[in-house]
Amino acid sequence: MNDRLSKIAIQITSFVAPHNPGIVEGKLQDAEGVVHTFVDKVPLFTSEMLDAHSQYPQDGNLECAVLSRWQDIDGQSLVQIRTIESIEGISEFVVLSSQVSD
């Protein structure tokens, strides 16, 4: 749809490992209510300095490419995005448009 990257809102739920930078777990709920889990370096999710002593959950985001936008039959605005791969092996998601920012 466009070449600019957008951001998808996620919840950073826990600190996983004290590497440099640290590794955290983040969760994304898609438009159908399915929760997807991501595990990666802190800077991919937030500019905050997070560690094992930080409070969780915290707001975060992931860069994503917007593939398409539409409204479903109920008038709900949806967006298909591509981002890093979840631990379930999925990298394309349909989310609510309110979860995506430019």
Q: Language-model segments: which ranges?
A:
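Short aromatic-glycine-enriched beta-strand elements
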Residues: 19-27, 74-81
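Sterically constrained small-residue positions within well-ordered secondary structures
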Residues: 17-19, 55, 72
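Beta-strand/loop nucleic-acid-binding surfaces
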Residues: 33-55, 91-101
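Short, compact, well-ordered microdomains
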Residues: 61-102
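Solvent-exposed strand-loop boundary residues in beta-sheet-rich modules
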Residues: 30-34, 85-87
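Structural detector for short beta-strands of small beta-barrel domains
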Residues: 3-18, 63-68
